[in-house]
Swiss-Prot record:
Alphabetical keyword list: Lyase, Magnesium, Metal-binding
Presence of keyword Magnesium: yes
Motif DDXXD motif: where in chain: 340-344
Presence of keyword Membrane: no
Chain sites annotated for binding Mg(2+) 1: 340, 344
Protein family (similarity comment): Belongs to the terpene synthase family. Tpsb subfamily.
UniProt protein name: (E)-beta-ocimene synthase TPS6FN
Pfam families tied to this protein: Terpene_synth, Terpene_synth_C
Length: 594
């Protein structure tokens, strides 16, 4: 399925919307002088803080885990684990090992073996000896890897599930948790999985209450590890966590598990640290690029969030072999962020019209029509994308049409402009209008279309690029890009809505729905969460319809929305929590021995 972005050209005649009470007079104003006329222009200011991650600090990063003796040790551990995985006779134990490898972030080292095992599981899927835990685990792993497993496989467990409902205890909890995690692979119209999620969520919450009460009464229990993973799952299910972010948490949790395998733990820690050392080199590269542009130095009204932009990248593609991918897409993230701030907080409507026109023309001569402060961002955008096209043609040896890439920037700038028009006119769009514009303005189409062409040197088959993206010539995008973008748009809104209103941005989905339906903020937030679940169902349907690289990028991008915005605006904010996230994933290695 394909989707065309709707760009509203006359915001005064849109039906169904209302005027908001937003006023720029309520927000910080910054005065600027326009050289051509010496006129003073009142500009908004978001008062973004400078980046806390200095160039010198990034260039000084070092890691002891590069090279020997750690790489030799990892190769030995990898051989040993591979032997265990392949030679396992117990089918359930094999599934559990695959799940553990995934959560530890090292399954990519055993990709061929895991695919072979799961293919055999799929062929012999109806195992009469499996209980709820085994069937739910197998179902989740198979769906995760793109197998079309029917939800009806759970019908054989009706009696077992009913018994659990009547009398839940600690022995059942791993089965309930497995079913809970599996239920998030629900597609449209899958009522069995929908009911399973409701039932298991209630059971898991009751279980946490029961354990909490036992601890208050000082009753001994053996569920420390179980309760930790249950609480973690209730906070956010596995299907909404990226491999790298989950690995950082799970390595610590797995170390506390009574029956943990020391060999797996050592491999996971070493792998995490070795991969992290490649991230340091990626960071040094993109920080040198950013310093060379001097955008952050000369135009300090916009966010300088290169480290935060890089964080998105390791959620999408963390493995060492994707260094090329990360260094390219990190630049895209920063350019999207920077240009967003030009539209959101600094440019006048007339200036934004000029910038949008310049992007449409994609011609360096257009800088002569732009105000001084827009010339550098425009040239950096133009030159960076053109250089990327050249480098892909040179390094990747695949065909790339720059018109596809240009189209994404034009659409995004038009959507930014639309939001600016809504703001300056005091117009609050309907939720539908907001969504049709917002899934473009969130920047996901720009990132995902460009990113597709950065995979060819990673043994990823990049074929049928024209078949996949020629729809852009007609104004449409692949459905999986839209669904990923909608999830990202809503997770962003849930975290940043209040802050964006304070600095005078256009209304978010929450305010649009509140005003359209005359409901409270709490009700609006619940509705947005419902729409996120609906978009996930659609994206689950998309699996298998597109190349695996595009599917994985889009899915991981949506997952990173939860990670970045789970506790606030992790993209813009530089509070202690955001700093800790970055430090633990990118800067600090995991101690091998504790």
């Amino acid at each position: 399925m394909l989707y065309r972005p709707k760009i509203y050209t006359n915001y005064n005649i849109i039906n169904g919307g209302t005027k908001s009470r937003l006023s720029s007079a309520c927000y910080p104003i910054q005065c600027a002088v326009v050289n051509s006329s010496n006129a003073i222009i009142d500009r908004r200011s978001a008062n973004f803080e400078p980046s806390i991650w200095s160039f010198d600090y990034i260039q000084s990063l070092t890691s002891q885990y590069k090279g020997e003796p750690y790489t030799s040790r990892v190769k030995k551990l990898e051989r040993d684990v591979k032997k265990i995985l392949v030679e396992m006779e117990n089918s359930l134990a094999q599934l559990e090992l695959i799940d553990t490898l995934q959560r530890l972030g090292i399954s990519y080292r055993f990709e061929n073996e895991i695919n072979s095992i799961l293919n055999k599981k799929y062929v012999n899927i109806n195992n009469p000896n499996y209980n709820l835990y085994a069937i739910a685990l197998e179902f989740r792993l198979l769906r995760q890897h793109g197998y079309a497993v029917p939800q009806e496989i759970f019908n054989q467990l009706k009696n077992e599930i009913e018994n659990i409902k009547k009398n839940i205890n600690g022995n059942d909890i791993m089965g309930i948790l497995a079913l809970y995690e599996a239920s998030f692979y629900e597609k449209k119209c899958e009522s069995i999985l929908k009911e399973a999620r409701i039932f298991t969520t209630e059971c898991l919450k009751n279980y946490t209450i029961m354990i909490s009460e036992q601890k208050k009464l000082m009753i001994d229990n053996d569920y420390d590890y179980d309760i930790e993973v249950v609480n973690h799952a209730l906070e956010l299910p596995l299907h909404r966590r990226t491999t790298r972010t989950e690995a950082k948490w799970f390595i610590d949790a797995y170390a506390k598990k009574q029956d943990m395998n020391p060999m797996l733990l050592e491999l996971a820690k070493l792998d995490f640290n070795i991969v992290q050392s490649t991230h340091h080199e990626d960071l040094k590269h993109i920080f040198r690029w950013w310093r060379h542009t001097k955008l952050g130095e000369k135009l300090n009204f916009a966010r300088d969030r290169l480290m935060e932009c890089f964080l998105w990248n390791i959620g999408i593609r963390f493995e060492s072999k994707f260094s090329y991918f990360r260094t390219k897409t990190a630049k895209l993230f920063e350019l999207v962020t920077f240009i967003d701030d030009i539209y959101d907080v600094y440019g006048t409507l007339d200036e934004l019209e000029l910038f949008t026109k310049a992007v449409e023309r994609w011609d360096v001569k257009m800088i002569n029509e732009l105000p001084e402060y827009m010339k550098m961002p425009y040239l950096v955008l133009h030159n960076t994308i053109n250089d990327m096209v050249f480098e892909v043609l040179r390094d990747q040896e695949i065909s790339i049409n720059i018109q596809y890439l240009k189209k994404t920037w034009v659409d995004m700038c038009k959507s930014f402009l639309q939001e600016a028009k809504w703001y300056y006119s005091g117009y609050t769009p309907t939720l539908e209008e907001y969504i049709e514009n917002g899934w473009i303005s969130v920047g996901a189409p720009v990132i995902l279309v460009h990113a597709y062409f950065f995979h060819a040197n990673n043994n990823r088959t990049i074929t049928n690029t024209k078949e996949i993206f020629e729809c852009l010539e007609y104004g449409y995008y692949p459905a999986i890009i839209r669904h990923s973008a909608i999830i990202l748009r809503f997770t962003n809104d849930l975290a940043t809505s209040s802050e964006e209103l304070k600095r005078g941005d256009a209304p978010t989905s929450i305010q649009c729905y509140m005003q359209e339906k005359i409901v409270s903020e709490e009700e609006a937030r619940e509705h947005i969460k419902f729409l996120i679940n609906e978009a996930w169902k659609e994206m689950n349907n998309d699996v298998g319809l597109y190349p695996i690289s595009l599917t994985e990028d889009a899915t991981n991008f949506a997952k990173m929305g939860f990670f970045i915005y789970q506790h606030g605006d992790g993209h813009s904010s530089q509070d202690n929590q955001s700093k800790q996230k970055i430090s633990s994933l990118i800067i600090e290695p995991i101690p091998l021995y504790t």
